[in-house]
Amino acid sequence: MTMQTRVARIHEYGDFDVIRIETDALPDPGPGEVILKQGAAAIHFADSYMRQGRYFLKPPLPTVLGLEGVGTIAAVGDGVADYTEGDRAAYLFNVGAYADARVVPAEALYVPPVDLDDATVVAAFVRTMTAQYLLRQLYPVASGETILVHSAAGGMGSLLTQWATSLGAKVVGTVSSPDKFLTAEENGCAHVIDYTKEDFADQVLDITGGAGVPVVYDAVGADAYEGNLRALAPRGWFVNYGHASGPPPIDALELNQKSLIFTKASMKDCVATPEEKAAMMEEVVAVIADGTVKLNITGRYELACIGEAHAALDSRTTTGALVTVFED
Protein backbone atom coordinates (compact mmCIF):
# COMPACT_ATOMS: atom_id res chain seq x y z
CA MET A 1 0.00 0.00 0.00
CA THR A 2 1.28 3.45 -0.90
CA MET A 3 2.07 5.57 2.13
CA GLN A 4 0.29 8.91 2.46
CA THR A 5 1.77 12.05 3.96
CA ARG A 6 0.36 15.43 4.88
CA VAL A 7 2.50 18.43 3.98
CA ALA A 8 2.49 22.21 4.37
CA ARG A 9 3.14 23.58 0.88
CA ILE A 10 3.23 26.94 -0.87
CA HIS A 11 2.29 27.47 -4.52
CA GLU A 12 3.23 31.15 -4.47
CA TYR A 13 5.23 33.53 -2.29
CA GLY A 14 3.37 35.69 0.18
CA ASP A 15 2.00 36.06 3.70
CA PHE A 16 1.32 33.17 6.06
CA ASP A 17 -2.04 32.51 4.42
CA VAL A 18 -0.39 31.13 1.26
CA ILE A 19 0.46 27.93 3.16
CA ARG A 20 -1.73 24.99 2.16
CA ILE A 21 -2.09 21.66 3.97
CA GLU A 22 -2.18 18.92 1.32
CA THR A 23 -1.99 15.13 1.16
CA ASP A 24 0.57 13.42 -1.07
CA ALA A 25 1.37 9.86 -2.01
CA LEU A 26 4.83 9.14 -0.66
CA PRO A 27 7.16 7.46 -3.17
CA ASP A 28 9.35 4.54 -2.22
CA PRO A 29 12.83 5.58 -1.11
CA GLY A 30 15.36 5.58 -3.93
CA PRO A 31 18.99 4.49 -3.70
CA GLY A 32 20.67 6.25 -0.80
CA GLU A 33 17.36 7.48 0.64
CA VAL A 34 15.11 6.68 3.59
CA ILE A 35 11.52 7.42 4.52
CA LEU A 36 11.37 9.24 7.84
CA LYS A 37 8.14 9.21 9.84
CA GLN A 38 8.56 12.49 11.63
CA GLY A 39 7.96 13.32 15.26
CA ALA A 40 8.75 17.03 15.03
CA ALA A 41 10.05 19.72 12.69
CA ALA A 42 11.64 23.05 13.50
CA ILE A 43 9.93 26.35 12.73
CA HIS A 44 12.60 28.90 11.86
CA PHE A 45 12.59 32.50 10.65
CA ALA A 46 14.31 31.04 7.58
CA ASP A 47 11.05 29.19 6.82
CA SER A 48 9.19 32.50 6.86
CA TYR A 49 11.81 34.09 4.61
CA MET A 50 11.47 31.16 2.19
CA ARG A 51 7.68 31.51 2.21
CA GLN A 52 8.08 35.17 1.27
CA GLY A 53 10.71 34.50 -1.41
CA ARG A 54 13.35 36.33 0.64
CA TYR A 55 15.60 33.38 1.51
CA PHE A 56 18.80 32.57 -0.35
CA LEU A 57 17.37 29.11 -1.11
CA LYS A 58 14.53 29.35 -3.62
CA PRO A 59 13.36 25.85 -4.53
CA PRO A 60 10.99 25.67 -7.50
CA LEU A 61 7.34 26.28 -6.66
CA PRO A 62 5.26 24.59 -5.46
CA THR A 63 7.42 23.53 -2.53
CA VAL A 64 7.03 22.07 0.94
CA LEU A 65 8.52 24.39 3.57
CA GLY A 66 10.77 23.50 6.49
CA LEU A 67 14.45 22.68 6.83
CA GLU A 68 14.93 20.54 9.95
CA GLY A 69 13.18 17.45 11.30
CA VAL A 70 13.49 14.31 13.39
CA GLY A 71 11.69 10.99 13.51
CA THR A 72 11.86 7.24 12.98
CA ILE A 73 13.00 5.55 9.78
CA ALA A 74 10.08 3.70 8.19
CA ALA A 75 11.81 2.36 5.06
CA VAL A 76 15.32 2.21 3.64
CA GLY A 77 16.42 2.41 0.00
CA ASP A 78 19.17 0.46 -1.69
CA GLY A 79 22.71 1.26 -0.69
CA VAL A 80 21.93 2.69 2.75
CA ALA A 81 24.36 1.03 5.14
CA ASP A 82 24.32 3.20 8.25
CA TYR A 83 20.59 3.18 9.04
CA THR A 84 17.89 0.54 9.30
CA GLU A 85 14.12 0.58 9.71
CA GLY A 86 13.19 1.65 13.23
CA ASP A 87 16.26 3.84 13.81
CA ARG A 88 15.76 7.32 15.17
CA ALA A 89 17.36 9.99 12.97
CA ALA A 90 17.35 13.72 12.35
CA TYR A 91 18.53 16.07 9.62
CA LEU A 92 19.47 19.69 9.02
CA PHE A 93 18.99 21.99 6.02
CA ASN A 94 16.93 19.71 3.81
CA VAL A 95 13.92 21.46 2.30
CA GLY A 96 10.57 19.74 2.90
CA ALA A 97 10.45 19.28 6.68
CA TYR A 98 6.81 20.33 7.11
CA ALA A 99 5.52 16.80 6.49
CA ASP A 100 4.46 14.00 8.78
CA ALA A 101 6.51 11.59 6.64
CA ARG A 102 9.03 12.29 3.91
CA VAL A 103 11.93 11.00 1.83
CA VAL A 104 15.35 12.15 3.07
CA PRO A 105 18.83 11.44 1.67
CA ALA A 106 20.62 9.19 4.14
CA GLU A 107 23.72 11.36 3.86
CA ALA A 108 21.76 14.25 5.39
CA LEU A 109 20.93 12.31 8.55
CA TYR A 110 22.55 12.28 11.97
CA VAL A 111 21.75 10.36 15.15
CA PRO A 112 20.35 12.73 17.80
CA PRO A 113 21.17 12.33 21.51
CA VAL A 114 18.94 9.71 23.10
CA ASP A 115 18.16 11.91 26.11
CA LEU A 116 16.57 14.67 24.01
CA ASP A 117 12.96 14.32 22.88
CA ASP A 118 11.98 15.12 19.30
CA ALA A 119 10.79 18.67 19.98
CA THR A 120 14.00 19.54 21.82
CA VAL A 121 16.17 18.12 19.03
CA VAL A 122 14.64 20.37 16.38
CA ALA A 123 14.53 23.35 18.73
CA ALA A 124 18.17 22.88 19.64
CA PHE A 125 20.51 21.89 16.89
CA VAL A 126 20.36 24.46 14.07
CA ARG A 127 19.97 27.30 16.56
CA THR A 128 22.83 26.14 18.77
CA MET A 129 25.05 25.42 15.76
CA THR A 130 24.31 28.93 14.51
CA ALA A 131 25.20 30.35 17.92
CA GLN A 132 28.45 28.38 17.84
CA TYR A 133 29.73 29.84 14.59
CA LEU A 134 28.53 33.35 15.47
CA LEU A 135 30.12 33.42 18.93
CA ARG A 136 33.07 31.07 18.50
CA GLN A 137 34.15 31.41 14.88
CA LEU A 138 33.15 34.70 13.23
CA TYR A 139 33.84 36.93 16.21
CA PRO A 140 35.17 34.92 19.19
CA VAL A 141 33.59 36.64 22.18
CA ALA A 142 36.00 37.19 25.08
CA SER A 143 35.43 37.45 28.81
CA GLY A 144 34.94 41.02 29.99
CA GLU A 145 33.59 42.37 26.69
CA THR A 146 30.30 44.23 26.51
CA ILE A 147 28.35 43.10 23.44
CA LEU A 148 24.99 43.89 21.85
CA VAL A 149 22.49 41.12 21.07
CA HIS A 150 19.23 42.03 19.35
CA SER A 151 16.02 40.06 19.95
CA ALA A 152 17.49 38.80 23.21
CA ALA A 153 14.27 37.05 24.22
CA GLY A 154 13.78 35.22 20.92
CA GLY A 155 14.87 31.72 19.98
CA MET A 156 18.31 32.64 18.62
CA GLY A 157 18.83 35.70 20.79
CA SER A 158 18.21 33.63 23.90
CA LEU A 159 20.92 31.13 22.97
CA LEU A 160 23.40 33.84 22.00
CA THR A 161 22.81 35.64 25.29
CA GLN A 162 23.11 32.52 27.43
CA TRP A 163 26.26 31.29 25.72
CA ALA A 164 27.96 34.70 25.59
CA THR A 165 27.23 35.23 29.28
CA SER A 166 28.81 31.85 30.07
CA LEU A 167 31.92 33.03 28.22
CA GLY A 168 32.16 36.02 30.56
CA ALA A 169 30.70 38.70 28.29
CA LYS A 170 28.31 41.38 29.52
CA VAL A 171 25.30 41.33 27.19
CA VAL A 172 23.19 44.34 26.33
CA GLY A 173 20.01 42.91 24.85
CA THR A 174 17.19 44.53 22.92
CA VAL A 175 13.55 43.41 22.97
CA SER A 176 10.42 44.61 21.20
CA SER A 177 8.07 44.90 24.18
CA PRO A 178 8.15 45.21 27.99
CA ASP A 179 6.75 41.71 28.48
CA LYS A 180 10.01 40.29 27.09
CA PHE A 181 12.22 41.98 29.69
CA LEU A 182 12.07 39.11 32.18
CA THR A 183 12.97 36.51 29.55
CA ALA A 184 15.96 38.55 28.40
CA GLU A 185 17.12 39.02 31.99
CA GLU A 186 16.72 35.31 32.73
CA ASN A 187 18.85 34.62 29.66
CA GLY A 188 21.64 36.63 31.28
CA CYS A 189 21.33 40.16 29.89
CA ALA A 190 23.06 42.74 32.09
CA HIS A 191 21.01 45.49 30.43
CA VAL A 192 17.72 45.21 28.52
CA ILE A 193 16.47 47.88 26.11
CA ASP A 194 12.99 48.13 24.57
CA TYR A 195 14.02 49.37 21.14
CA THR A 196 10.44 50.45 20.33
CA LYS A 197 10.55 53.03 23.13
CA GLU A 198 14.23 53.92 23.51
CA ASP A 199 17.07 54.66 21.10
CA PHE A 200 19.12 51.53 21.65
CA ALA A 201 22.29 53.08 20.21
CA ASP A 202 22.13 55.99 22.67
CA GLN A 203 21.60 53.52 25.50
CA VAL A 204 24.54 51.36 24.40
CA LEU A 205 26.83 54.38 24.19
CA ASP A 206 25.72 55.46 27.66
CA ILE A 207 26.35 51.98 29.10
CA THR A 208 29.81 51.82 27.53
CA GLY A 209 30.83 55.37 28.43
CA GLY A 210 30.71 56.40 24.79
CA ALA A 211 33.07 53.66 23.61
CA GLY A 212 30.51 51.48 21.84
CA VAL A 213 30.57 47.70 21.63
CA PRO A 214 33.08 45.55 19.72
CA VAL A 215 30.35 43.39 18.17
CA VAL A 216 26.61 43.43 17.52
CA TYR A 217 24.64 40.28 16.73
CA ASP A 218 21.68 41.32 14.61
CA ALA A 219 18.71 39.52 13.10
CA VAL A 220 16.46 42.58 12.87
CA GLY A 221 18.01 43.91 9.67
CA ALA A 222 16.94 47.20 8.10
CA ASP A 223 15.21 48.73 11.13
CA ALA A 224 18.32 48.36 13.30
CA TYR A 225 20.93 49.28 10.69
CA GLU A 226 21.62 52.94 11.53
CA GLY A 227 21.54 52.26 15.26
CA ASN A 228 23.99 49.39 14.89
CA LEU A 229 26.49 51.65 13.13
CA ARG A 230 26.27 54.17 15.97
CA ALA A 231 26.45 51.54 18.72
CA LEU A 232 29.61 49.89 17.39
CA ALA A 233 33.10 50.86 18.48
CA PRO A 234 35.70 51.66 15.81
CA ARG A 235 36.80 48.44 14.07
CA GLY A 236 33.69 46.76 15.49
CA TRP A 237 32.02 43.71 13.98
CA PHE A 238 28.48 43.99 12.59
CA VAL A 239 27.37 40.34 12.55
CA ASN A 240 24.05 39.92 10.74
CA TYR A 241 22.32 36.55 10.72
CA GLY A 242 18.76 37.51 9.78
CA HIS A 243 16.57 40.29 8.41
CA ALA A 244 13.15 40.27 10.07
CA SER A 245 12.54 43.85 8.88
CA GLY A 246 14.30 43.45 5.53
CA PRO A 247 17.99 43.27 4.59
CA PRO A 248 20.27 45.91 6.12
CA PRO A 249 21.05 48.61 3.50
CA ILE A 250 24.81 48.17 3.65
CA ASP A 251 26.82 51.17 2.48
CA ALA A 252 30.59 50.67 2.29
CA LEU A 253 31.22 54.37 2.83
CA GLU A 254 29.23 54.32 6.06
CA LEU A 255 31.18 51.30 7.30
CA ASN A 256 34.39 53.11 6.40
CA GLN A 257 33.62 55.98 8.80
CA LYS A 258 34.57 53.76 11.77
CA SER A 259 36.45 50.97 9.95
CA LEU A 260 33.57 48.58 10.69
CA ILE A 261 33.50 44.97 9.52
CA PHE A 262 30.17 43.61 8.23
CA THR A 263 29.57 39.89 7.84
CA LYS A 264 26.59 37.73 6.97
CA ALA A 265 27.85 34.19 7.18
CA SER A 266 26.35 30.89 6.11
CA MET A 267 26.71 27.78 8.23
CA LYS A 268 27.78 25.72 5.23
CA ASP A 269 31.03 27.70 5.09
CA CYS A 270 31.63 27.14 8.81
CA VAL A 271 31.25 23.36 8.52
CA ALA A 272 32.93 23.00 5.14
CA THR A 273 34.78 19.80 6.08
CA PRO A 274 33.74 16.68 8.04
CA GLU A 275 36.28 17.66 10.68
CA GLU A 276 34.77 21.13 11.12
CA LYS A 277 31.27 19.69 11.35
CA ALA A 278 32.36 17.08 13.91
CA ALA A 279 34.07 19.73 16.05
CA MET A 280 31.01 21.97 15.95
CA MET A 281 28.62 19.13 16.80
CA GLU A 282 30.83 18.06 19.71
CA GLU A 283 30.72 21.54 21.24
CA VAL A 284 27.01 21.95 20.52
CA VAL A 285 26.13 18.67 22.23
CA ALA A 286 28.33 19.66 25.19
CA VAL A 287 26.72 23.06 25.81
CA ILE A 288 23.23 21.56 25.56
CA ALA A 289 24.14 18.69 27.90
CA ASP A 290 25.81 20.84 30.57
CA GLY A 291 23.06 23.46 30.58
CA THR A 292 25.11 26.33 29.16
CA VAL A 293 22.20 26.86 26.78
CA LYS A 294 18.64 26.10 27.78
CA LEU A 295 16.04 25.52 25.12
CA ASN A 296 12.74 27.25 25.81
CA ILE A 297 10.04 25.85 23.54
CA THR A 298 7.22 28.38 23.74
CA GLY A 299 5.04 27.16 20.88
CA ARG A 300 4.08 23.66 19.73
CA TYR A 301 1.89 23.59 16.63
CA GLU A 302 0.14 20.81 14.79
CA LEU A 303 0.80 20.76 11.05
CA ALA A 304 -2.69 22.11 10.32
CA CYS A 305 -1.85 25.21 12.41
CA ILE A 306 1.52 25.97 10.83
CA GLY A 307 0.13 29.18 9.34
CA GLU A 308 -0.57 30.44 12.87
CA ALA A 309 3.07 29.81 13.76
CA HIS A 310 4.23 31.81 10.75
CA ALA A 311 1.85 34.64 11.66
CA ALA A 312 3.38 34.73 15.15
CA LEU A 313 6.90 34.81 13.69
CA ASP A 314 6.03 37.57 11.26
CA SER A 315 4.55 39.69 14.06
CA ARG A 316 7.88 39.50 15.96
CA THR A 317 5.99 38.80 19.19
CA THR A 318 7.43 35.35 19.89
CA THR A 319 9.92 34.34 22.55
CA GLY A 320 11.88 31.10 22.63
CA ALA A 321 11.60 28.40 19.98
CA LEU A 322 8.62 27.20 17.93
CA VAL A 323 8.18 23.64 16.67
CA THR A 324 5.58 21.62 14.82
CA VAL A 325 4.72 18.23 16.27
CA PHE A 326 3.21 15.32 14.38
CA GLU A 327 0.68 12.76 15.57
CA ASP A 328 1.83 9.17 16.05
Model region roles, listed by residue range:
Residues 2-3, 275-328:
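C-terminal hydrophobic helical "lid"/dimerization subdomain
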Residues 3, 15-18, 24-70:
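N-terminal glycine-rich beta->alpha transition that marks the start or flank
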Residues 37, 50-51, 70-94, 170:
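A glycine-/small-residue-rich N-terminal strand-loop-strand element
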Residues 49, 88-153:
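NAD(P)H dinucleotide-binding glycine-rich loop of Rossmann-like/cofactor-binding domains
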Residues 122-197:
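Mid-domain Rossmann-like dinucleotide-binding core that forms the NAD(H)/NADP(H) cofactor-binding site
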Residues 151-152, 220, 243:
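NAD(P)H cofactor-binding loop motif with strongest signal on the N-terminal glycine-rich segment
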Residues 175, 223-293, 325-328:
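Glycine-rich phosphate-binding loop and adjacent beta-alpha segment
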